[in-house]
Curated annotation (Swiss-Prot):
It catalyses: L-homoserine + ATP = O-phospho-L-homoserine + ADP + H(+). Catalyzes the ATP-dependent phosphorylation of L-homoserine to L-homoserine phosphate. It holds the Pfam family GHMP_kinases_N. Keywords: Amino-acid biosynthesis, ATP-binding, Cytoplasm, Kinase, Nucleotide-binding, Threonine biosynthesis, Transferase. The gene is thrB. One of its GO terms (molecular function) is ATP binding. This is Homoserine kinase. Pathway: Amino-acid biosynthesis; L-threonine biosynthesis; L-threonine from L-aspartate: step 4/5. GO terms for cellular component: cytoplasm. It is found in: Cytoplasm.
Length: 298
C-alpha cells in the first residue's frame, strides 16, 4: 500500500434480483474490486487488468474526474485491482463505488451516502452510457436495496440462511446497451406488468416478515426481462431446470447477463453450484455467496 493512501473494497452486486427491474439490487460477498487512492497531479489510472486507463473511459476514472472538478482537488491516482467478474455482477459499479469512497476518505470530504451514490452512478456512464443505481446503491450500502431516486432508497436485511449461487459463462459478453435494446423490441403486456408488480410486492413483504422462502421463490417470477434476455445466456433453459431440480428456490438472470443466479438454502448451495457448472461443462466462473455489508475501507 502506498504511504498516505486509502484502500477500499467494494463487492459484486446482483441487479434486478428477478422481477425488480431497475429497482432492486443485492450486494453479495466473495468477489470484490479493490481501489487504492492517493493524492497526485491530475487523474491517473494504474492497473494490471485489461481495462481502460483513460479516466474518461474508466468507471473509477470518471468518478475521480468529477470529484476532482467539484471539490477542486489537486488530483488523484487510482490503483485498481479487479476481482468482480464482468458480465452481470456489477463489475463497473464496484470500481466506481470503491473509487468514490476511497477519494472521499483520502481527502476527508465527509460526503453523505447520497452524494457518494451520485458520484458512483456518474462513473457508470463510462460502462453503460447512463447512470444505473441498482448496482451502485447495494454496492455502497450493502444488503438488499430498493431504489427510486438519488435520495430515495431503502436497505432491507435478507435472511441469513439463504445463499446466492452465481454462474458466469466464459467467452460470452453482453453489454448493458444490448440488453436494454432487446427489451424495447418486446414491450411487456399488461399481464406481464401485473405479474412483476405482484412478485415485487411479495418479495418486499417477505423480507419484512423474515419469510426467506417466499422471497426466494418470487425471484424466479420475472416476466419482463427474462423472456427477452434469456437468449443471451447459453443453455438458459437447462440451467434453470437444473437449478430447480437440485434444490434452488429461485432462479434468474443477474443484471444484463450473461451471469445467472440461484437462491438456495445454505445446505443446498454447493450442490446447485456443481450442477450448474456441469451444465456449462465447467466453462464458467461460479461461486456461493452470502449477502455483503457493502463497500468497506480496508
Amino acid at each position: 500500500m502506498t504511504p498516505l493512501s486509502t484502500v477500499v473494497r467494494a463487492p459484486a452486486t446482483i441487479a434486478n434480483v428477478g422481477p425488480g427491474f431497475d429497482v432492486f439490487g443485492l450486494a453479495v460477498d466473495g468477489f470484490h474490486d479493490v481501489v487504492e487512492a492517493h493524492e497526485a497531479d491530475g487523474v491517473r489510472i494504474v492497473t494490471e487488468d485489461p481495462i481502460p486507463t483513460d479516466p474518461e473511459r474508466n468507471t473509477a476514472g470518471r468518478v475521480a474526474l468529477r470529484m476532482v472538478e467539484e471539490f477542486d482537488l489537486p488530483g488523484v491516482s487510482l490503483e485498481i485491482r479487479k476481482g468482480v467478474p464482468m458480465g452481470g455482477l456489477g463489475s463497473s459499479a464496484a470500481s466506481a463505488v470503491a473509487a468514490a469512497v476511497a477519494i472521499d476518505r483520502e481527502f476527508e470530504l465527509g460526503l453523505e451516502e447520497s452524494e457518494l451514490l451520485r458520484f458512483a452512478a456518474e462513473g457508470e456512464r463510462a460502462a453503460a452510457g447512463e447512470p444505473h443505481y441498482d448496482n451502485v446503491a447495494p454496492c455502497l450500502l450493502g444488503g438488499f436495496v430498493i431504489w427510486r431516486f438519488e435520495r430515495e432508497y431503502v436497505r432491507l436485511e435478507v435472511p441469513g440462511d439463504l445463499r446466492f449461487v452465481t454462474v458466469t459463462p466464459t467467452g460470452v459478453r453482453v453489454t448493458t446497451e444490448e440488453a436494454r435494446k432487446a427489451l424495447r423490441e418486446r414491450p411487456p403486456s399488461l399481464d406481464d406488468v401485473v405479474n412483476n408488480l405482484s412478485a415485487v410486492a411479495l418479495m418486499v413483504h417477505a423480507l419484512h416478515e423474515e419469510d426467506a422462502e417466499t422471497f426466494a421463490r418470487m425471484v424466479g417470477w420475472d416476466r419482463i426481462s427474462e423472456p427477452v434476455r434469456k437468449r443471451f445466456v447459453p443453455r438458459y433453459r437447462e440451467l434453470r431446470e437444473t437449478a430447480y431440480g437440485t434444490g434452488a428456490l429461485g432462479f434468474a438472470i443477474s443484471g444484463a447477463g450473461p451471469t445467472v443466479f440461484a437462491v438456495c438454502w445454505r445446505e443446498d448451495a454447493e450442490d446447485v453450484r456443481t450442477a450448474l457448472e456441469d451444465v456449462l461443462d465447467g466453462k464458467c466462473v461460479s461461486a456461493v455467496h452470502r449477502v455483503s455489508d457493502g463497500a468497506e475501507v480496508a
